[in-house]
Amino acid sequence: MLELKWDGKDVALKTAEKIPLRLLDFDSSLSHGEKNSGNIIIQGDNLKAMKSLLPFYRGQVKCIYIDPPYNTGAAFEHYNDNFPHSDWLSMMYPRLEMLREFLSDDGAIFISIDDTEQAYLKIICDEIFGRDNFVANFFWRKRTAKSDVPHGISQDCEYILCYAKSESFHGSIKGKERKYFLTEDFPNRAWRYHDLTKQTTAAERPNSFFTIVNPKNGEEFPAQVNRTWAITMETFKSYYEQDRIIFPGDYDFLKISKPVLRYWKDDDIKKSGENFGMVAASTFLPADVGMSQNGTKEITEIFGEKKFSFPKPSSLIQHLIGIAVTTDKNSIVLDAFAGSGTTAHAVLNLNNVDGGSRKFILIEEQPYCNTITAERVRKIGGDFNFYRLGEKISDSEGKINPKVTFEQLAGFIWFSLTKSPYIQTEHSPLIGIHNGTAIYLLYNEILTRNILAMLPKHDGAKIIFGSACRIDDDFLKENKISFRQIPKELSL
């Protein structure tokens, strides 16, 4: 397989695994709306944030969209877009490796890029996701042509690379609704019709080169030499007996000049299942996804001023994530380069269109994470919990970092099991009950029978986090206790 080499790649290959697990500190003052919405915005380095999220969301994200720096050499106000080439590759590689771990087996990632690094990005994505999992390279027209450009050629398009986690991914979009008819002869069974010819020659399909005769009036419809029927004579007879052949004149509202084939709506639904009404997505994105100017206009309308350079229009991101999640209304969408928060906007828009309850996870390192990324979501009425990256959970010896308080560790554990923030009411080893299971934190204590006897009582299942356990497995099983050693098992 083709492999891309650059100075620093050996270090980049080991970067992700060396990132320590960190706390995620909940900030209620910057959160908005329902605390159990499942939507999350995290301020912090995206590689560190993803490492801390991975124990909770590994294999659960249906769609990832990222808009990383393009490495164009431009100096944008809000982010660095001027990496040396090898540094850009070393920045992207571990992040793509970690993003792959988030994807569900039927999930996909979409990556915006331009000509500067597109070819190199394709090669490293082939390495990370597998060449066989390359889905498509979408073309997005970002602007109309400019005249003042190098070499007299206006680069008006950008690209969106799409890779699947596995062959289980199937992308599609909502198509224009097919027109079905209810008629007097079939008042309870809707139908549509389709062309009965095929673009093949008589030499290619001799069995389909015949004359169809209308049994009701004897009118003849011969096949064309360069366009035969799509069926054989035997199939025609079978379809006619099933009321599937429609002739000119059968229905006054149908303006047809040759026989067509009837399809029943209930058969379409049965065949398509949850994909009924869906069509294949084209790599040529439709004009209604908008251009860069639409993204800028959107930001200006929300904030009353241009707060961000070159934001993508939410209609573009909505179209892309729709390819992956239109038929899954409860999926999770992740954006690790959140920027102005367009991905959250797109998820909320898609939910408004079809009544879905998809969740978003946004990660943004820059200070504007609150003032632009999160504020945009607040202004459009989205609910989310706001987190910041906190302390490392363990020290160099693998022990709990002494800077980590009981409350902080309790919050991390509670989030890991419930995906919701920990609201402390009192200092107790019983940090909460979730779905009938009591969750205990002993911090640096060892679980013994004496310690167990002192814990707040709970009749159901128990998960107990501690530094070690001195109770035998049979007793734990008999008392519905699952022990988890910290910090080791926090990342499992």
Predicted segments — roles?
Residues 43, 65, 69, 112, ...:
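Generic enzyme active-site microenvironment
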Residues 59-74, 125, 333-347:
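Conserved proline-anchored active-site loop of SAM-dependent methyltransferases
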Residues 304-315:
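Conserved SAM-binding loop and adjacent beta-strand
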